[in-house]
């Protein structure tokens, strides 16, 4: 064994060098954490006084009425104290994306004339532990100093997810805990209201929703027809509209679009008008803009064989014809064989009035419309194509919901089943049989409707092949008046 020579002091020098490297690494990490935390914390204290008011928010009447009390409290908190009334510390705005949650929060601050501190919940959290909690403390400290004030936390589900959830994380939980501490720590004389927004209220931690925290909940839903018309008018105020523009008609065919979608529709229409060199937005621009928002731009350059083009026309004509002939179905408003996105063509349907309740008969008509393209292909060619795959998926999902959610089956009438819950093999087979029976019944209805009005199917197909797109007026000229719709079918 040959011992290795060791220079005097070598091990000490190496130890000191290693210790120095470790100190530098730790120092850099601490500096980086403080720098990042400080940089983002400084942005937390940025404050504004919005000029937005409730008059800038079209629709949402009930939500504005609910929040008017918050405005009164922020304007005159002493009045509430004299009455011994405790205002909610937190207000949760819950609803689908684009329904105006942020706009409404800004309008509350604008109406009250108070400072508005806004952050997205995802901005609180970094990879470093403790940074999120520090930003929460900084945000609430700034709001207390500026009292009366509003703190707005957008997408609070980013940090407010139910603790113990498989997708939760230690830093998110610490940040949530700090938010809870701050909500509990308000002094009675501090007029600070916290407004949070979420699309997923179902996953929020119950501790957020208990009294004294976010104990006032305001649900925002997609706008109804009257609200859509009001939203369109608000966003059309600064845009030149041609005399043929009918915003009420546009509101009728934009069922399911949010306020943000409607704003985007008008902006798209303005861009389309500029693209064609026009000085005004026409109804045609608006119709094309709706199609773009819903399904994307048309694909005119896509090469199709004559048979494929005809098949698409037959398929879309089938949807439109069944929708027109069935009294309880939504009316066809626009049909096109121009491809958009992954779709070969499209049939746009819209009810004469918004619905809140559906009967089994109405759902059955809706199923028949979904299967109208399938039935038309089968009637014309004796076989079907892959173009019906999306329709079949939607029809199957609706039939499943009718049986398992709405109790509209026959052998399982009046019963509901948890979609993710366990059921016996016998019940599972019964559900499958009920769903299959509903789809078969709807397909038979669609096929019978098309066979009884084959001349109208031929007329629609010919018009689509010649014109590519048919609007509501053109459809009415070809198909004639619709059957009278019963009040409840």
Curated annotation (Swiss-Prot):
The keyword Nucleus belongs to this UniProt entry's keyword annotation: no
SUPFAM superfamilies, per the entry: FtsH protease domain-like (SSF140990), P-loop containing nucleoside triphosphate hydrolases (SSF52540)
Ranges facing Cytoplasmic side: 1-14
Protein keywords: ATP-binding, Cell membrane, Hydrolase, Membrane, Metal-binding, Metalloprotease, Nucleotide-binding, Protease, Transmembrane, Transmembrane helix, Zinc
Cellular compartment(s): Cell membrane
Binding site for Zn(2+): 315, 319, 391
EC number annotated for this UniProt entry: 3.4.24.-
Membrane topology: Single-pass membrane protein
Domain of life of the source: Bacteria
Family from the record: In the central section; belongs to the AAA ATPase family. In the C-terminal section; belongs to the peptidase M41 family.
Descriptive protein name: ATP-dependent zinc metalloprotease FtsH 3
């Amino acid at each position: 064994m040959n011992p290795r020579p060791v220079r005097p002091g070598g091990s000490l020098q190496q130890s000191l060098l290693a210790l120095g490297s470790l100190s530098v690494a730790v120092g850099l990490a601490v500096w980086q954490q403080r720098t990042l935390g400080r940089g983002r914390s400084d942005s937390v204290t940025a404050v504004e006084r919005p000029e937005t008011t409730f008059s800038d928010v079209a629709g949402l009447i009930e939500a504005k009425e609910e929040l008017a009390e918050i405005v009164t409290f922020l304007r005159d908190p002493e009045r509430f104290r004299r009455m011994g009334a405790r205002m909610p510390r937190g207000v949760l705005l819950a609803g689908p994306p684009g329904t105006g949650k942020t706009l409404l929060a800004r309008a509350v601050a604008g109406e009250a004339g108070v400072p508005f501190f806004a952050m997205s919940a995802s901005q609180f959290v970094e990879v470093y532990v403790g940074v999120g909690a520090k930003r929460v403390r900084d945000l609430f400290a700034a709001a207390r100093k500026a009292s009366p004030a509003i703190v707005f936390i957008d997408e609070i589900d980013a940090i407010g997810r139910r603790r113990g959830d498989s997708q939760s994380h230690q830093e998110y939980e610490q940040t949530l805990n700090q938010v809870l501490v701050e909500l509990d720590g308000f002094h009675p004389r501090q007029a600070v209201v916290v407004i949070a927004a979420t699309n997923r209220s179902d996953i929020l931690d119950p501790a957020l929703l208990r009294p004294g925290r976010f104990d006032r909940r305001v649900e925002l839903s997609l706008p109804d027809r009257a609200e859509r018309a009001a939203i369109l008018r608000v966003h059309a105020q600064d845009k030149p509209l041609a005399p043929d523009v009918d915003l009420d008609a546009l509101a009728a065919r934009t069922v399911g679009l949010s306020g943000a979608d409607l704003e985007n529709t008008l902006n798209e229409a303005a861009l389309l008008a500029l693209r064609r060199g026009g000085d005004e937005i026409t109804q045609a621009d608006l119709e094309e803009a709706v199609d773009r928002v819903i399904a994307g731009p048309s694909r005119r350059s896509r090469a199709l064989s004559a048979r494929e083009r005809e098949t698409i026309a037959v398929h879309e004509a089938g949807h439109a014809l069944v929708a027109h002939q069935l009294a309880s179905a939504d009316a066809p408003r626009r049909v096109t064989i121009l491809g958009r996105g992954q779709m070969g063509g499209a049939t746009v349907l819209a009810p004469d009035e918004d619905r809140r309740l559906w009967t089994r008969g109405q759902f059955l008509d809706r199923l028949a419309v979904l299967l109208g393209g399938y039935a038309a292909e089968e009637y014309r060619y004796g076989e079907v194509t892959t173009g019906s795959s999306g329709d079949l998926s939607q029809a199957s999902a609706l039939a499943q919901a009718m049986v398992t959610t709405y109790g509209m089956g026959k052998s399982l009438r009046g019963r509901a089943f948890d979609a993710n819950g366990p059921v016996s093999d016998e019940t599972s087979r019964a559900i499958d049989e009920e769903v299959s029976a509903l789809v078969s019944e709807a397909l038979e209805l669609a096929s019978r409707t098309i066979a009884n009005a084959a001349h109208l199917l031929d007329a629609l197909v010919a018009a689509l092949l010649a014109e590519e797109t048919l609007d509501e007026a053109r459809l009415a000229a070809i198909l004639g008046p619709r059957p009278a719709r019963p009040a409840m079918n």
